[in-house]
Amino acid sequence: MPSPLDSPLFSLVHLAREMRKAPTPSEGLLWGALRDRRFRGVKFRRQHVLHPYIVDFYAPMQKLVVEVDGAYHRDRGEVDAARDLDLAAYYGVRVVRIDAALVERDLLAALRVLGGHLG
């Protein structure tokens, strides 16, 4: 009988834990502003599994996913758009994409963008 530890979900959870230990600079900056309900009292989770994906940040009560897009995402527009549609269809979430350069250059501007999606 296969072990539950061999399941794809377990692998994603393990990977998400590892990703939390080594955030990108922009993810680290944004997490500092979001953690412990610091931004508008909203609870965010980081590197959260929404099977089959791991999202950068997730606000469950608002059903909002926040993705910080760095250089890796610049040529992945179609793939990212399909992923966003999957997340919306399967989980009923909205996806906000924020450029990593904006987070690093002007965190307050990035938070204003995010705030515009929180209502």
PLM segments and residue spans:
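Basic, amphipathic alpha-helical patches used to engage nucleic acids or provide basic targeting signals
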Residues: 18-24, 46-117
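Solvent-exposed, charged helical/coil patches
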Residues: 1-42, 102, 118-119
